[in-house]
Amino acid sequence: MRPSGRQPDQLRPVTLTRHYTRHAEGSVLVCFGDTHVLCTASVLPKVPPHKKGSGEGWVTAEYGMLPRSTHTRSDREAARGKQSGRTQEIQRLIGRAMRSVFDLSALGEHTIHLDCDVLQADGGTRTASITGAFVAAHDAISVMRKKGQLTGEPIRDFVAAVSVGVVDGVPVLDLDYPEDASCDTDMNIVMTGAGGFVEVQGTAEGTPFTRTEMDALLGLADHGIRTLIGLQKQALGL
C-alpha cells in the first residue's frame, strides 16, 4: 500500500482552476494532491532576437518556488543573485513541452510567456507545471484569437506530464514527496494527446532499473497522461 493509500496506477486528486488571477491572459491553479502551482500565460508583443523578422512567435517559461512552499524556508533565488541549475532545467523543460504542440508561425511575432510559481510542493512540481501551463496557454490563445492577433491555429495538440517511479520494487504513478524521496527509480514523462513522447527523464537512484520496469513505467505514464489530458479538456469545456 502506498503512503497515500492509492493504487499503483492511481493519480492524486487533480484540479485545474482557470481564470485564477485577474490580469494575465491565461491563469490556472493546478493541484496534484498537495502540490499546488499557479501557472500564468502572458501575451507579449515581441519575440527573442533569433525570431525577429521571421514572422514567427515564441513560447517560453519561467519556474520558481515560493520560499515556504517546502517544509523549511528557502531563500528566494533573486536574493541569491542567480537561478539554480534545477530551476533552469525545469523552465527549459516547460518551454520545450509547450513548443512541441505549438505552430509558432500562427502566433505572428508574439511571445507567450508562461510563469509557473509553486505555492506548495509535495512532489511532481514540474509535471504539474506543464499540465497547468498548457491550459493557461490555451486560454491566452483564445484571447489572442478574439483580438485578431493570430495568423492561424497555433495549438496542434494537447500536452501533459506526470511522474512515475519504482518504489519498494513496485512501479507507481504520480509520486508524492515521501515516494520521490525513497524511490529506486524516478522518471518524468511528457506526452502529447496523440500519444507521442516529448520528453523522458529517468534516473536510477541506486538500483538500476530493468527494461521490464521501464516498459511498465512508460505504460503507467501513458495511462496517467491520457487521464490528465481528459481533465484539461474538461476544464476547458472541450
UniProtKB/Swiss-Prot annotation:
InterPro entries per the UniProt record, alphabetical: ExoRNase_PH_dom1 (IPR001247), ExoRNase_PH_dom2 (IPR015847), ExoRNase_PH_dom2_sf (IPR036345), PNPase/RNase_PH_dom_sf (IPR027408), Ribosomal_Su5_D2-typ_SF (IPR020568), RNase_PH (IPR050080), RNase_PH_bac-type (IPR002381), RNase_PH_CS (IPR018336)
Disordered: region residues: 67-87
MF GO annotations: 3'-5'-RNA exonuclease activity; tRNA binding; tRNA nucleotidyltransferase activity
Gene Ontology annotations of biological process type: rRNA catabolic process; rRNA processing; tRNA processing
Catalysed reactions, semicolon-separated: tRNA(n+1) + phosphate = tRNA(n) + a ribonucleoside 5'-diphosphate
Domain of life of the organism encoding this protein: Bacteria
Any Pfam family: RNase_PH_C
Keywords: Nucleotidyltransferase, RNA-binding, rRNA processing, Transferase, tRNA processing, tRNA-binding
Record-listed phosphate binding positions: 86, 124-126
Listed PANTHER family: EXOSOME COMPLEX COMPONENT (PTHR11953), EXOSOME COMPLEX COMPONENT RRP41 (PTHR11953:SF0)
Family: Belongs to the RNase PH family.
Name the record gives this protein: Ribonuclease PH
Species assigned in the record: Ralstonia nicotianae (strain ATCC BAA-1114 / GMI1000)
